[in-house]
Amino acid sequence: MKKIIIMAGGTCGHIFPGLEIAKSLINKGWKVFWLGTSKNIESKIVPKYGITIKYINISGVRGKNLFELMAIPFKLIIACYQAKKIIENINPDIILGMGGYVSVPGGIISYLYKKPLIIHEQNKIAGLANKLLSKFTTINMQAFANTILTSKSITVGNPLRTSITNLKKSWDRFENRSGPLRILVVGGSQGTQIFNFCFPKVALVLKNKIKLWHQIGKKNINIIHKLYDIHNNLAIYKITPFIKNISKAYFWADLIICRAGALTVSEIQYIGLPAIFVPFPHKDQHQYWNAYPLKMIGGAKIIMQERFNVNVIITLLKNLNRQKLIVMAKKLRSSYKLNSIKTITKIIENITH
């Protein structure tokens, strides 16, 4: 039985693509191990899939003060020693890094022990960990073309959940719909405050011309409820702290307004759901560049956060109808040609053949 260690943690954007790859390999008879940290969400998510998870002590560099930054080299040495013990014990045939700081110690040790190392970068702009490890890999897999500029790079897309890939094509979902446009507003699991305070006002102006399904997060729930309730008797809306079944929400929607995380962008492109992206203003603007290809093919629009306001959204929505959205949807879906999980699985099998 062949063995793989998947290194991923910290955010769902690293973890869930790794889990889809893990499920594919398990179905082919592989034994999958996971390398993460005990303090982050991978410690709660990964064991639910029956995958053995091993822990190292490591944290990221963002938001650290000078004293904490000075301690990082020592912590990295400790984490590398922990990763060394884990890799020696498991003796994997290959190691896969999904990005994020947790993949760095294992990546370093895999190189020193001459274990095949491959990485997957979900974003259009590569993260620091993958930039570092890309110099020591057998293959660099990337969701977007020209992200990691080496001869070892292969564009494979992002691994998507089966609940997403099983959805009907967008024009089959809403071609025969009538009535108000169905608009899904998603600000991430924590909500997005600029969305939360904008869309009650949008509902007030557009009233029954739209239907809103708004994921508001857990902050200020009562305030947001009151904002929607005030003067919005004619508006049609549903608000919830968190949407557990995002596939159901995608199926319902004609249009989504959201951030531009890598997985969200890939899911939207695959199912053909027209989008208005409001990229989070990271320093490297990676969310903008995630969304940019969809804008260029005519399947999405981008509003930078500094330009985002009620009037801009209302103007955009007034200029949209289902006929225009169907055209956008077809452009999105026809542009997605990658079978990511199948391709990644084959790459792993070929390297370890």
From Swiss-Prot:
Listed Pfam families: Glyco_tran_28_C, Glyco_transf_28
Pathway field: Cell wall biogenesis; peptidoglycan biosynthesis
GO aspect biological process, one term: cell wall organization
Any coiled-coil regions, as ranges: none
GO MF annotation list: UDP-N-acetyl-D-glucosamine:N-acetylmuramoyl-L-alanyl-D-glutamyl-meso-2,6-diaminopimelyl-D-alanyl-D-alanine-diphosphoundecaprenol 4-beta-N-acetylglucosaminlytransferase activity; undecaprenyldiphospho-muramoylpentapeptide beta-N-acetylglucosaminyltransferase activity
Bilayer topology annotation: Peripheral membrane protein
Positions contributing to UDP-N-acetyl-alpha-D-glucosamine binding: N123, R161, S189, I243, A262, L263, T264, V265, S266, E267, Q287
Recorded catalytic activity of this chain's protein: di-trans,octa-cis-undecaprenyl diphospho-N-acetyl-alpha-D-muramoyl-L-alanyl-D-glutamyl-meso-2,6-diaminopimeloyl-D-alanyl-D-alanine + UDP-N-acetyl-alpha-D-glucosamine = di-trans,octa-cis-undecaprenyl diphospho-[N-acetyl-alpha-D-glucosaminyl-(1->4)]-N-acetyl-alpha-D-muramoyl-L-alanyl-D-glutamyl-meso-2,6-diaminopimeloyl-D-alanyl-D-alanine + UDP + H(+)
GO cellular component, one term: plasma membrane
Top-level taxon of the source organism: Bacteria
Keyword Membrane appears in the UniProt entry: yes
PANTHER family associated with the record: GLYCOSYLTRANSFERASE, UDP-N-ACETYLGLUCOSAMINE--N-ACETYLMURAMYL-(PENTAPEPTIDE) PYROPHOSPHORYL-UNDECAPRENOL N-ACETYLGLUCOSAMINE TRANSFERASE 1
Function: Cell wall formation. Catalyzes the transfer of a GlcNAc subunit on undecaprenyl-pyrophosphoryl-MurNAc-pentapeptide (lipid intermediate I) to form undecaprenyl-pyrophosphoryl-MurNAc-(pentapeptide)GlcNAc (lipid intermediate II).
Entry's family note: Belongs to the glycosyltransferase 28 family. MurG subfamily.
Protein name, UniProt field: UDP-N-acetylglucosamine--N-acetylmuramyl-(pentapeptide) pyrophosphoryl-undecaprenol N-acetylglucosamine transferase
Organism, scientific name: Buchnera aphidicola subsp. Baizongia pistaciae (strain Bp)
